[in-house]
Amino acid sequence: MREERPIIALDFPSFDDVKDFLEHFPEDEKLYVKIGMEFFYAIGPEIVHYLKGLGHSIFLDLKLHDIPNTVRSAMSVLGTFGIDMVTVHAAGGVEMMSEAKKVLGDKAKLVAVTQLTSTSEEDMRDCQNIQTTVQESVVNYARKAKEAGLDGVVCSAQEVELIKAATADDFLCVTPGIRPAGSEIGDQKRVMTPQEAHQIGSDYIVVGRPIIQAENPWDAYHEIKKQWNS
């Protein structure tokens, strides 16, 4: 089921920055926010508990990737935080993903990172020794995530239709690399607008800089939300 709220990537260096950012929004507006590695490692679980206490939904993007037993143990802890969605790396393999899903259960949605939106085919060839296209690699990882029982994957909107065809219509596609029309693409190479992501079948979109660096974050958020739901 498609999430109507864009997920806001809280890519801030400090707790105070997040508090300042949230002041742009009324208290009764419940957001869906992403906490990434930098912020979580700097602040710890306290940030999750704080945001959940305010009634916001949490996408914890830690991209766990280790041996199956270690990821299982880590996920058993994360599952107690009240998060709504969390990530592992599909490259960790079917057993690792399956163990993570078993211990997490229905406490939160578990999605796998396929190829990062900053990854080019040259990067895949030179650094990962993968001699296929980005799309072929992403679809293969998506199939493995589905096999492991995960709820979906993180992928570029450009791969959504292929992934749905290779897995299932209800297999979730979480799409970063979303930029409003005319904005800077930054360091992400595979990007789309909110409208394009909607039309192509994305279930969630993740937006960072166009909202958190906007002069008026509330206006920017609602404009992107409007585009996403149009």
Curated annotation (Swiss-Prot):
GO molecular function per UniProt: orotidine-5'-phosphate decarboxylase activity
Binding positions (substrate): 11, 34, 61-70, 117, 179, 188, 208-209
Pfam families: OMPdecase
Pathway: Pyrimidine metabolism; UMP biosynthesis via de novo pathway; UMP from orotate: step 2/2
A biological process term (GO) from this entry: 'de novo' pyrimidine nucleobase biosynthetic process
Protein keywords: Decarboxylase, Lyase, Pyrimidine biosynthesis
Annotated S-S bridges: none
Stretches that traverse the bilayer: none
SUPFAM superfamilies reported in the protein's UniProt record: Ribulose-phoshate binding barrel
Active site per UniProt: K63 (proton donor)
A single cellular component GO annotation: cytosol
Enzyme Commission code(s) on record: 4.1.1.23
Catalysed reactions listed for this entry: orotidine 5'-phosphate + H(+) = UMP + CO2
InterPro entries noted in UniProt: Aldolase_TIM (IPR013785), OMPdecase (IPR014732), OMPdecase_AS (IPR018089), OMPdecase_bac (IPR047596), OMPdeCOase_dom (IPR001754), RibuloseP-bd_barrel (IPR011060)
HAMAP family per UniProt: OMPdecase_type1_B (MF_01200_B)
Family designation: Belongs to the OMP decarboxylase family. Type 1 subfamily.
Function: Catalyzes the decarboxylation of orotidine 5'-monophosphate (OMP) to uridine 5'-monophosphate (UMP).
Subunit structure comment from the entry: Homodimer.
Protein name: Orotidine 5'-phosphate decarboxylase
Organism: Streptococcus sanguinis (strain SK36)
